[in-house]
Amino acid sequence: VDNLLISQPDAGEQALEIADTLVRSGAVDVLVVDSVAALVPRAELEGDMGDSHVGLHARLMSQALRKLTGTVARSNTLMIFLNQIRLKIGVMFGNPETTTGGNALKFYSSVRMDIRRIGSIKDKDEVTGNQTRVKVVKNKMAPPFRQVEFDIMYGEGISKVGELIDLGVKAGVVEKSGAWFS
């Protein structure tokens, strides 16, 4: 935590300029943008509530990613964009889910992962963690469409005990029978 930099810019353009500057400087190894949905374009912030800004967010992301792609490729920086899932209105067939910010991020990214909470972990009546599923949706570096499930314990992170049990089952050292292990 000693080497953690946090920036809370006013607008999306400012956030992406800061990101570009940090990547160019070579001073950071990992840069996380949390979240793409929060990168609100300046014109939208300065406009009135009822104003229509169709495609402004998508244009911002497209311009920024064109610039950032080359910069990131020449640097030794890992850039992570967190995003949210939204539902498309009126979709009858196909997947109604989409991500914010247009298609640029889908196109320019090297790896895309879909991370979802699939259940809760409880100790009696108290929720102590989440069961999580990660699907690799796109991968330019390795085979795509792989999937993994693991437990995230609050205040702890990924459950070491759960991982050891899963590895034991996979290796044949631990036997699983329903919800019981032996």
Curated annotation (Swiss-Prot):
GO cellular component, one term: cytosol
One Gene Ontology term of the molecular function aspect: single-stranded DNA binding
Primary location recorded for the protein, binned into one broad class: cytoplasm
Cystine connections: none
GO-annotated biological processes: DNA recombination; DNA repair; SOS response
Keyword DNA-binding: yes
InterPro entries, per database record: DNA_recomb/repair_RecA (IPR013765), DNA_recomb/repair_RecA_CS (IPR020584), P-loop_NTPase (IPR027417), RecA-like_C (IPR049261), RecA-like_N (IPR049428), RecA_ATP-bd (IPR020588), RecA_C_sf (IPR023400), RecA_monomer-monomer_interface (IPR020587)
Cellular localisation: Cytoplasm
Superkingdom of the organism of origin: Bacteria
Keywords noted in UniProt: ATP-binding, Cytoplasm, DNA damage, DNA recombination, DNA repair, DNA-binding, Nucleotide-binding, SOS response
CDD domains per UniProt: RecA
Function: Can catalyze the hydrolysis of ATP in the presence of single-stranded DNA, the ATP-dependent uptake of single-stranded DNA by duplex DNA, and the ATP-dependent hybridization of homologous single-stranded DNAs. It interacts with LexA causing its activation and leading to its autocatalytic cleavage.
Protein family per UniProt: Belongs to the RecA family.
PANTHER family: MITOCHONDRIAL DNA REPAIR PROTEIN RECA HOMOLOG-RELATED, RECA
Name of the protein this chain belongs to: Protein RecA
Recorded name of the encoding gene: recA
